[in-house]
């Protein structure tokens, strides 16, 4: 077991906390503050325990000097200050005397945030490649380290693994958000209430191979939608018209279907159109009758009903990836239907594994109907694959 924040003595300590404040921005304004809100319980806990808090995060990718102008965390510090109802000192540096002196002048109960960790990527990708000197330097700025950024836990960066490895034995822990992610996703996969129904969507089988292989040994049924369904349907010998397909993954899809012993459930109908756009004529056909000149862009009503019949029986549901082209209203009905089916469950643990399916549930107003909506897209996927997450692995054991 990894240490959690409640295992650390924080009194009067300088607490380095890696958060995931990689929020969407438009014209310098934050368009969705969910990730900041999710970190508040851990932040408040630190402040209530008489500590000095030093926060940092990445924001987008920083490839050229010009990126700095649109990738500063200044607006995030201002938003956090507003949400906390207290001043957050922002230091627009990632190292140096100005930052060090601001940290040394912090009093217990005060908050400082320093600049986007990926500004360090401009000079040889020091953050993303976990430069040992950078990890050591950042670790030297505090007494203890808390990692509450689940979204980057599947990456070994200087700001998570680098600090954890250099902060000293027993001085690192995960925050409440990471603890919650590990608990819900971990239990759903490794010790689920049954039946466990997994619903996987999205465009590519290649993104989900590891997840399907891991879940084949653990789930009772795996319902497959999204464009990746066409690789499976073609593997079964069906004509899929001009639908998106990964031809180099057909053998793998055949193999997964053969291994699945009926656990994998494929769509029985699909919504088709002649082009990948919303304002176009569309119709629904059975998967055996897809014309040569049409492409499937969503699961059909019969499939929604079929999937619903499995979802209704579930005691645990894990959902990752939309059922169709959710951003186009004519091809969003499958995702909406599945989302509603899961939201209607009253006696089940329901988990959304981040990314587009989380956005769908939130935009449909169903966020509070799910047991847990993950904050990490790639990290959730790797965790569902049964992989070790470097950002968690580097944390002190209890």
Swiss-Prot record:
Q: Note whether Cytoplasm occurs among the keywords.
A: yes
Predominant cellular place of this UniProt entry's protein: cytoplasm
Keyword Nucleotide-binding listed? The answer is yes
The UniProt record gives the binding positions of ATP as: 208, 296, 327, 354-357
Q: Which reaction does it catalyse?
A: (2R)-3-phosphoglycerate + ATP = (2R)-3-phospho-glyceroyl phosphate + ADP
Please name the SUPFAM superfamilies in this protein's record.
Phosphoglycerate kinase
**UniProt keywords, alphabetically:** ATP-binding, Cytoplasm, Glycolysis, Kinase, Nucleotide-binding, Transferase
**Localization terms from the record:** Cytoplasm
Question: Which GO terms of type biological process are on file?
Answer: gluconeogenesis; glycolytic process
Q: Binding residues for substrate, per the UniProt record? A: 20-22, 35, 58-61, 118, 155
Quote a single Gene Ontology cellular component term. cytosol
Record text on subunit structure and interactions: Monomer.
- Family per similarity comment: Belongs to the phosphoglycerate kinase family.
UniProt-recorded name of the protein: Phosphoglycerate kinase
Source organism per entry reads: Fusobacterium nucleatum subsp. nucleatum (strain ATCC 25586 / DSM 15643 / BCRC 10681 / CIP 101130 / JCM 8532 / KCTC 2640 / LMG 13131 / VPI 4355)
Task: Write the lineage as a comma-separated list.
Answer: Bacteria, Fusobacteriati, Fusobacteriota, Fusobacteriia, Fusobacteriales
Q: Which gene encodes it?
A: pgk
